[in-house]
């Protein structure tokens, strides 16, 4: 439990325009019983849908090859809470959703914990490159060392203290 503060003010009290600048990928991704595409562009104005942006995001989140193998591609229905998908596929769709909204600040909360090591490393490398290209700041919460290898700064919370490790 906790809260996110910006200038000592709870983020829930800040204008929605500010909130749109922040993306979040939780450990447990919720997917609607809808298409992959609608789960990714969820929350975005459908009038602003951009197919080329979606394709770039699918590549960055390593979900493009999986989607291209499906007969209906991004129009494939995922079932209630992603029942037709693996945990790793659901996580990659969650990452794609967060990136599609084009935040300036992205929080990854154990966002790659259901991925195999190779896919995880590829996504982390892609996110590192994406963040440089898009001027995106990423805060990654993780217990895995390989996740931390892609971070420019590392902090550890220990005994209620924040310690800089890198």
Segments from the language model and where they lie:
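ABC ATPase NBD coupling module
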Residues: 10-23
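Helix N-cap at the start of a conserved alpha-helix in ABC-type nucleotide-binding domains
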Residues: 117-118
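A short, proline-enriched helix->beta-strand linker immediately N-terminal to the Walker B motif
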Residues: 100-104
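Catalytic Walker B motif of ABC-type/P-loop ATPase nucleotide-binding domains
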Residues: 106-110
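Conserved catalytic loops of ABC-family nucleotide-binding domains
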Residues: 129-140, 148
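Hydrophobic anchor residue at the start of the ABC signature
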Residues: 95, 141
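ABC ATPase nucleotide-binding domain helical subdomain, centered on the C-loop/LSGGQ "ABC signature"
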Residues: 3-7, 19, 37-80, 124-127, ...
